[in-house]
Amino acid sequence: MNTYAQESKLRLKTKIGADGRCVIEDNFFTPPFKLMAPFYPKDDLAEIMLLAVSPGLMKGDAQDMQLNIGPNCKLRITSQSFEKIHNTEDGFASRDMHIVVGENAFLDFAPFPLIPFENAHFKGNTTISLRSSSQLLYSEIIVAGRVARNELFKFNRLHTKISILQDEKPIYYDNTILDPKTTNMNNMCMFDGYTHYLNLVLVNCPIELSGARELIEESEGVDGAVSKIASSHLCLKALAKGSEPLLHLREKIARLVTQTTTQKV
């Protein structure tokens, strides 16, 4: 049962406006969602912040998000704050997100980290459809719990799936299952003493494998690696003992990518 009596929905569709920049063509949302009007921090790159007017996700909360980024749009989507998953008791909270990125469009999806509280159970499913000319920078950061309270890996279960298709052909699939009841989260194959995890995917972005590795090596307090996936796209995964090192690493990569992507001809 949803806290808001119905599934929480968000719809966003963008297009190129009269001035040649990305604008909102259509949008719709139900509580707790809201959207800020786009602003333009750099050239023709628009930035839209997704707002959730709530303390976080509770038992039974279900979110349905659909984002359609129009052809030639250049857009960065952010969130307002860290996302909290509260104690879901004997239930769970969920999110289904479908993203379409049109021809010659660029999307930088950069939400703040996800924090599962004690006994939290969360299910997330993201499907992203691209064209061959689409560019994507997509990330998620997962925290071990309320670190300042030493509440580490006390959540029930966290399961997120990311599926990326290019011209209807799958090019990337990630299935992250964190279940402290059945897995030692601190073993060397999992968090290995770290508390924050970054998963970043780059499709058709102007950054080389060697360049991404250099940025990881330059990042103090970060242990990570990057590899090529289908069609020479990149997947980067990193661990740290705080959110700031991972957010800084992600921002450095995004800055490098957008410097090229948003250059006016």
Curated annotation (Swiss-Prot):
GO cellular component, one term: cytoplasm
Location relative to the cell: Cytoplasm
GO molecular function annotation: nickel cation binding
Keyword Chaperone among UniProt keywords: yes
Cited InterPro entries: UreD
Record keywords, A-Z: Chaperone, Cytoplasm, Nickel insertion
Its job: Required for maturation of urease via the functional incorporation of the urease nickel metallocenter.
Family: Belongs to the UreD family.
Subunit structure: UreH, UreF and UreG form a complex that acts as a GTP-hydrolysis-dependent molecular chaperone, activating the urease apoprotein by helping to assemble the nickel containing metallocenter of UreC. The UreE protein probably delivers the nickel.
This protein's name: Urease accessory protein UreH
Gene assigned in the entry: ureH
